[in-house]
Each structure stands twice: as structure tokens, then as C-alpha cells.
Amino acid sequence: MSTLHLIDHPLVQHKLTLMRRKEASTNSFRRMLGELSTLMAYEITRDMPLQDIEIETPLETMTGKVIDGKKLVLVSILRAGNGFLDGMLNVVPGARIGHIGLYRDPETLQPVEYYFKMPSEMEERDVLVVDPMLATGNSAAAAVARLKQLNPKSIKFMCLLAAPEGVATMQKAHPDVDIYTAAVDRQLDAHGYILPGLGDAGDRIFGTK
């Protein structure tokens, strides 16, 4: 069974509460999402492998540590996942970026893929899939299944909010993929939105309706 990691740092919880407010502007919502993704990135990357290298300081030679292996790949589930990227890149500026375009059929709530573009050498890379909301879990599960066809070294999933239903879907479909979230909310409504949630993350990031 995959592990659910709740990132409950006080700054994360503070900013998340401010983002949830219906009166939060597009600008403030977008800014706080970037700040949150930076904070969450520290937790998610704490187990990245390291290797020793010899370097010269201004005073002497020493052995230091750097991230081992190929660059991390951040995979955004379009379009809302893009809101995470700038904040994540503050922490891992050398990361490669992939995109998966999925939309949720309003009748079946099942994902339909319309775009898929990844960096090269995926089999040598660790992957972090990002999407602000883990609602039904169908889109996240479909994205991970598609990525597994490329045989990456590992896959993690990061979201801002999760519903219990979405967590259950992901854990059943992909028990090997850890989930990182700032909160697990109460439930989904009849339309597949998270309650109490924060509304449609994509609309709030981009100022659309």
C-alpha cells in the first residue's frame, strides 16, 4: 500500500487556509500556490539520493554531496498542475518538465487524454506528478498508469488537497506510488468536487470560469 504523507507544517496550513477563502483574488491564490509548492518540495525531495564529489573551496579541497542520477522530472497534469511548477523549480531548478493533458468527462467523471509530452531517458529518472486536487483520483491514476509505460525509476504524486475517495482510488490502482498532500478533506460532492475544498483550482489559478 502506498504511503499518504500529510505535510502539516504551520506555514503550509496557514497559506492553505488563506487560499481556501472565496474572496482570495486570482493574484493572491496564484502567489500562495507558488509559495506552498516551494514549501512542500522540501519535504518531498528529502529522500533524493546523493553522491560524493571532490570540490575546491577558496581555502582547500573537500568532499561535498550533490544529487545523484539524472534530473528529476516534474509532470504537470494540465492545466492546474502548471500552478505548482514555478514554486517547485525554486527548489529543483534543473528539473525537467513533462505535461499530461487530461480532462474529466462530466458524465462519467473518467479521464480522457488529449496531450502527452515527456523528456528523454525517462527510464533513468525519478518522477513527481503534480496536480492541486486529488478528487475522484481517476485522472491521477490514469496519468501514473501512462507514465509507468515509460518505466521511470520511481513515481510520486503531489497535490494540495485530497479527498478520501481519491486517496483510495490511487492506493488501489498504484500501491507503489506515495501521495503527498497538505490536507485530506471530508468528501466529494455529487459533481466530483472536494468538500470543503477551495473550488476549481484551475479557474482560480488562471482567473477563468
From Swiss-Prot:
EC number of the protein: 2.4.2.9
Binding positions (uracil): 194, 199-201
EC supergroup of this enzyme: transferase
Cofactor mode of binding and number, as noted: Binds 1 Mg(2+) ion per subunit. The magnesium is bound as Mg-PRPP.
Domain of life, per lineage: Bacteria
Catalytic reaction annotation: UMP + diphosphate = 5-phospho-alpha-D-ribose 1-diphosphate + uracil
Residues noted as binding 5-phospho-alpha-D-ribose 1-diphosphate in the record, renumbered to the chain: 79, 104, 131-139, 200
Record-level Gene Ontology MF annotations: GTP binding; magnesium ion binding; uracil phosphoribosyltransferase activity
GO biological process, one term: UMP salvage
Regulation: Allosterically activated by GTP.
A Pfam family annotated for this UniProt entry: UPRTase
The protein's annotated pathway: Pyrimidine metabolism; UMP biosynthesis via salvage pathway; UMP from uracil: step 1/1
Cofactor(s) needed by this chain: Mg(2+)
Alphabetically ordered keywords of this record: Allosteric enzyme, Glycosyltransferase, GTP-binding, Magnesium, Nucleotide-binding, Transferase
NCBIfam families noted in UniProt: PRK00129.1, upp
Role noted for this protein: Catalyzes the conversion of uracil and 5-phospho-alpha-D-ribose 1-diphosphate (PRPP) to UMP and diphosphate.
PANTHER family: ADENINE PHOSPHORIBOSYLTRANSFERASE (PTHR32315), URACIL PHOSPHORIBOSYLTRANSFERASE, CHLOROPLASTIC (PTHR32315:SF4)
Family per similarity comment: Belongs to the UPRTase family.
UniProt-listed HAMAP family: Upp_B
Name assigned to this protein: Uracil phosphoribosyltransferase
Species name: Delftia acidovorans (strain DSM 14801 / SPH-1)
Gene of this entry: upp
